[in-house]
Swiss-Prot record:
InterPro entries: ProX/PRXD1, YbaK/aa-tRNA-synt-asso_dom_sf, YbaK/aa-tRNA-synth-assoc-dom. GO terms for molecular function: aminoacyl-tRNA deacylase activity. CDD domains: PrdX_deacylase. This is Putative prolyl-tRNA synthetase associated domain-containing protein 1. The gene is PRORSD1P. It holds the Pfam family tRNA_edit. Gene3D superfamilies: YbaK/aminoacyl-tRNA synthetase-associated domain (3.90.960.10). Belongs to the PRORSD1 family.
Length: 169
């Protein structure tokens, strides 16, 4: 599926769940630093997404944290029970295969494309921070989509993923 088709497929799934979203288009961005000037006016929790694999390339994780978090992969590996030093960034080819999105577009909204190979790790601050909206890329890094934390969790569970919720404070 091409980018526009993926975006339409996402919108169809969200619509089927009666999930209301707010979308802001902006220039393509590849880092949180590039993104923030375009969306800092949006109130809520903004995301940073890491697509990771274990050393043996048998397991994949999509890790979604607040945009300003610094993540220690060794600490995260211990929390996930995979052993320090065993987590690394997956390449774009793996992300395209598993989530159908490329570099700069990692998003938990792409979990509907996964056939069950990707484990989803979510920063507890998205659910416990009292945020009116949480923001992610909608299958493209040229837009940002906001939805309520409750609707986001409903969507993630509809994809067949039970999030691993971790506290990153």
């Amino acid at each position: 599926m091409a980018g526009a088709e993926l975006g339409a497929a996402l919108e169809q799934r969200l619509g089927a769940l009666a999930i209301h979203t707010e979308v802001v288009e902006h220039p393509e961005v590849f880092t949180v630093e590039e993104m923030m000037p375009h969306i800092q006016h949006l109130k809520g929790a903004h995301s940073k997404n890491l697509f990771l694999k274990d050393k043996k390339k048998k397991n994949y994780w999509l890790v979604t944290v607040l945009h300003d978090r610094q993540i220690n992969l060794n600490e995260l590996a211990k929390q996930l029970g995979v052993g320090s030093g065993n987590l690394r960034f997956a390449d774009e080819t793996a992300m395209l295969e598993k989530l159908k999105v490329g570099q700069g577009c990692a998003t938990p909204l792409a979990l509907f494309c996964d056939g069950g190979d990707v484990k989803f790790v979510l920063d507890s601050a998205f659910l416990e921070g009292g945020h009116e909206k949480v923001y992610f890329h909608p299958m493209t890094n040229a837009a940002t989509m906001g939805l309520s934390p409750e609707d986001f969790l409903t969507f993630v569970k509809m994809t067949g993923h039970d999030p691993i919720i971790l506290n990153f404070d």
